[in-house]
Amino acid sequence: CGLRVVRLGLRQEASTGEFPVQMLCGVSESGQQLAQRLVDRFARHWPVLVPRHWAGLAPDVLAAVAVRFPASARLDADDRRDLMNFSEGCRGFELTLPVLRQLEQCAGVVAWLADAPDFPLWCRVVTQGWSWNAVRVAGLCSGQKEGEARLRKLVGELLKNGPEL
């Protein structure tokens, strides 16, 4: 239908427990430009807002919103090296987290990740900022060591078979 998510409420509605969503489809040229500006802005704000306001949202819901965002980041040679080193176990998770967050904003990455079996783990730890203990309690991994190993494997697969970075 052409509607695009331009805003997601910061608080759940009291009556339904749902987050309000604002969607827009410009019908005139100026309306289309406005819609694009709002989508671009929402995409830029997304990485900051998700862990603060939507940390409990289901990974498939987050993916459904984020997959429609325009690419807002590009990786440089240093970033790609960090990802390779992380996937090979030579760089720590916390040191790589800024690049992992940036990776989500590259063209086609969220769509590729959303199809991966470990996307819920990625989403909870990388996108939503859950602690390793929280993902363990949620049953997504047995702890940090196993969780990091699975994320390393996922990044390695993305580098080999994912979208061009």
Language-model segments: which ranges?
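Terminal substrate-recognition subdomain of acyl/acetyltransferases
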Residues: 2-165
